[in-house]
A protein has these predicted regions:
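Single conserved hydrophobic/aromatic residue that forms the stacking wall/gate
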Residues: 86-89, 93-94
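Short helix-boundary/capping micro-motifs
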Residues: 12-27
Length: 94
């Protein structure tokens, strides 16, 4: 599971639409589907129930959602902390 897969999962979970999520992520729908399929394969669970007209989270998808949100938020917070530390180091060395 990687950061990009988490972002793809979270975006599809929010939009419940692969085409809309792909547009939002500036990628193609097949590329987005590949990321979701890879995540599903790694977790050995279907995360979305797909029909020709609807997308819905499965029970596994609903179970993953709060953890994916926490993980992604943690990644963003870690980046911010490192960036802040890096900026502070440059200020004190000047």
């Amino acid at each position: 599971m990687n950061e990009h897969q988490l972002l793809c999962f979270l975006t599809v979970s929010r939009t419940l639409n692969f085409s809309a999520a792909a547009r939002e992520l500036y990628c193609t729908q097949p590329a987005l589907s590949y990321q979701i399929r890879s995540l599903e394969k790694e977790l050995d669970a279907a995360l979305f129930r797909r029909t020709t007209t609807q997308v819905a989270l499965t029970e596994a998808g609903r179970a993953l959602l709060p953890h994916a949100e926490d993980l992604y938020r943690g990644i963003l917070n870690a980046r911010t902390a490192v960036s802040y530390t890096h900026l502070r180091a440059h200020e004190t060395c000047a």
